[in-house]
Amino acid sequence: MWHRFALLLPLQACACLAAGPDVALDIGHYLEEPGVISASGVSEFELNRKLAQAVAGVLGEDGVQVRLIGEDGLHASLTARTREARGTRLFASIHHDSTRAKFQPVRDARFAGFSLWVSRQNRAAAASIACARHVADRMIEAGFAPSHYHADPVFGEGRPVVDWQRGIFARDALAVLNTANSPAILIEAGVVVNPAEEAHLRDPAVFRSQAAAIAAGLRDCLRDQ
């Protein structure tokens, strides 16, 4: 009996070590290419990192294991990000949105709201879309509104609509979405080149509410798996 346990225990330990985090939270952009600059002059990377850290904190309090990707600001390769996420059950990339340059500075209220993005080429495309719906539902429940301008060929880029009501669009060729080995979504938290939207999202209470809503949506995604 002793020898049987001696053989079993190392195998059990190996199984524990092999288990990875539940969620990979990817921080969009990096220090050398920080993404859009907000209306108040803050880089998108800094906004993405702050929100991802807050979401990770909420998930951690609920016992969800999170792997933050790109926190050091040095992750230039998109495919390296999805490779680093291997072993996780869900990939979510955190971003903040912009508009086409000709519409800046933003004075039009249509350029506001969150959006979610999926790749229909992802190996778990149906689960990715279902997850995006979960996050959108939690955001809407918390009082955030989806944006729709990305579908417009003039005001946006004519992107394919996956779910209009929830602000979900397709970017099939985006590397962080179509090379992920798990369901994958990209979250645009809001249009930060819009001064009113940026100020609203950076309000501490609103910021906490958004982080909690995103975390709740991601928990719903995990529950469905």
Q: Could you say what each language-model-derived stretch is?
A:
Residues 20-22, 47-225:
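Active-site-proximal helix/loop segments of hydrolytic enzymes
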Residues 31, 38, 44, 96, ...:
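Short, flexible micro-motifs
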Residues 21-41:
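Short glycine-rich His-centered loop
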Residues 10-15:
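N-terminal signal peptide c-region/cleavage motif recognized by signal peptidases
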Residues 1-8:
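Sec-dependent signal peptide recognition
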Residues 5, 16-17:
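Cleavable N-terminal signal peptides
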